[in-house]
Every structure is written in structure tokens, then in C-alpha cells.
């Protein structure tokens, strides 16, 4: 069993195309998508058209949910540029995407955590903004009741693998389309990948257990940085250009 996991495309269709090409080059034919597909100051329509055409298993992210359950005037800074690009078909499709899924009986999929699509699972944020791996006992509490040996999540745009004490593995593949952002919950903090590459992971079930290969894929990130800047989001543009926002 071998497949690719993508997450957090955020409307970056050039990064998505580069990742899909790399997946094909690796001989992988199966894909799961962990959500946050379209929101951002980029090209929501092209990204969602491409994802809708994929033979993939999708779960919905918090930004996907906000596109379909909030009136426009209450949408956030990443939804407002994306929403006008989408038509009824895109939004209806997003409504069909579940919050969680099980892939081939062996893999549990969610965007952030099994119960909440907008909290961090594998990371903790200190009052001073420092980000560290969350304590194992806190991670394991949120994994209670999940029987699958592999658990996949996204949301934090941070590639990471955590082995639980019972042998299960939780993996975040990193973000395809957004290598950095700032956020104020639970405390003001900044996530920065340090390079502008598109990220995803290849998972393989071997006789010894799950193998994880984190992939960093270069693409025309400068073009997407220019688009973000043209759409008025200098922070997103900086992340796309360099992998850093400050």
C-alpha cells in the first residue's frame, strides 16, 4: 500500500500542479487530500477545478467550511479573495466533502483533529509565540478511539511525524501551497517553513510498518508571490517568495 498525502493547497494551483507531477514521477497513483483547498489570495478556481477532477479521497478543512457556511461579509482575509472566483458547482462540491474519512480501512484522515478542524494537534504555541511539538499525552488524548494504524492531519502547514506509545503514527505532510502565515490563536505566532517549496508526503505500508517520505518540490513560486502581492496580501507574498514572512 503506497499513496501520497497532500494538504493546504490554499489556491496555489502552480504548487499543486508541481506536486501532482512529482507524485506521478514517483510512480504513485493514489492520493488523499486533507483540506483547505481554495482559500487565499491566489487562484481558487483553477485549484478547485484540478482537485475536483482528481480521483482522490478528500476531507474538508476549516477554510473550506468557512467558504460554505459564512456570509461573505463575515468571511476572513483568505476567503474573501477566493469566494468570488467560485461558482455554485464548486461550493456544492465542497458541501459534499466530509470532515473526516477512513482510507482503505487503514488510514484515518482529518484536517486538524478528529473533532475540530481549527485547532493544532501536533504543535503547541507558548504565550511568547514559540512553537514546539505538543506533549505526547495531549496528542494521544485526541487520538483516542481511532483504530487505524496511520492518522493524517494538516492545518498547521508543518511537516511532522509523531509515533504514539501504542505504535500508531500521526503524520502532517506539510502544505502544498502556503509555506508561512501568522495567526493570533491561542497566542500570536508565526509559522514559517524556511523555503518556498511545495510540500507533501508519500506513505508506504512495509512489513516493518509505515514509512514516510516528506517531499519538497520546487515550482514557479515567484509567479504566485506576484499574484498574492497584486491581490494585496504582502505577508502571503513574502511566504511564497522565500518561505519566510518576517
Model features per residue range: what roles?
Residues 1-4, 102-109, 164-168, 208-210:
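Beta-strand-turn-beta hairpins that frame and shape the catalytic cleft
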Residues 1-56:
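N-terminal active-site segment of His-dependent metallophosphoesterases
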Residues 6-7, 31-36, 40, 57-62, ...:
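Active-site neighborhood of phospho(di)ester-bond hydrolases with catalytic His/Asp-centered motifs
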Residues 10-15, 39-42, 64-69, 102, ...:
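Active-site environment of divalent metal-dependent phosphoester hydrolases
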Residues 23-28, 103, 144-147, 202, ...:
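Glycine-rich phosphate-binding loop signature in dinucleotide/nucleotide-binding domains
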Residues 47-109, 115-147:
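Active-site neighborhood of divalent metal-dependent phosphoester bond hydrolases
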Residues 133-164, 168-173, 183:
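Anionic-ligand binding region
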Residues 163-246:
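Acidic, His/Gly-rich catalytic cores of divalent-metal-dependent hydrolytic chemistry
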Amino acid at each position: 500500500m503506497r499513496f501520497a498525502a497532500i494538504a493546504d493547497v490554499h489556491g496555489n494551483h502552480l504548487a499543486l500542479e508541481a506536486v501532482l507531477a512529482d507524485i506521478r514521477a514517483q510512480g504513485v497513483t493514489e492520493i488523499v487530500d486533507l483540506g483547505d483547498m481554495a482559500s487565499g489570495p491566489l487562484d481558487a478556481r483553477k485549484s478547485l477545478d484540478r482537485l475536483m477532477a482528481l480521483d482522490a479521497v478528500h476531507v474538508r478543512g476549516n477554510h473550506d467550511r468557512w467558504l460554505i457556511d459564512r456570509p461573505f461579509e463575515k468571511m476572513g482575509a483568505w476567503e474573501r479573495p477566493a469566494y468570488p472566483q467560485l461558482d455554485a458547482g464548486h461550493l456544492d462540491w465542497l458541501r459534499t466533502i466530509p470532515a473526516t474519512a477512513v482510507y482503505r480501512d487503514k488510514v484515518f484522515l482529518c484536517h486538524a483533529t478528529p473533532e475540530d478542524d481549527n485547532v493544532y494537534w501536533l504543535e503547541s504555541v507558548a504565550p511568547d509565540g514559540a512553537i514546539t511539538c505538543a506533549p505526547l499525552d495531549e496528542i494521544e488524548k485526541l487520538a483516542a478511539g481511532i483504530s487505524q494504524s496511520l492518522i493524517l492531519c494538516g492545518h498547521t502547514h508543518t511537516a511532522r511525524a509523531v509515533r504514539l506509545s501504542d505504535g500508531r503514527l500521526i503524520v502532517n505532510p506539510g502544505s502544498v501551497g502556503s509555506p508561512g502565515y501568522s495567526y493570533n490563536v491561542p497566542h500570536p505566532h508565526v509559522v514559517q517553513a524556511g523555503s518556498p517549496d511545495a510540500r507533501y508526503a508519500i506513505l508506504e505500508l512495509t512489513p516493518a510498518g509505515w514509512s514516510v517520505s516528506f517531499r519538497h518540490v520546487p515550482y514557479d513560486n515567484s509567479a504566485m508571490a506576484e499574484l498574492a502581492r497584486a491581490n494585496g496580501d504582502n505577508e502571503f507574498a513574502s511566504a511564497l517568495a522565500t518561505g519566510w514572512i518576517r
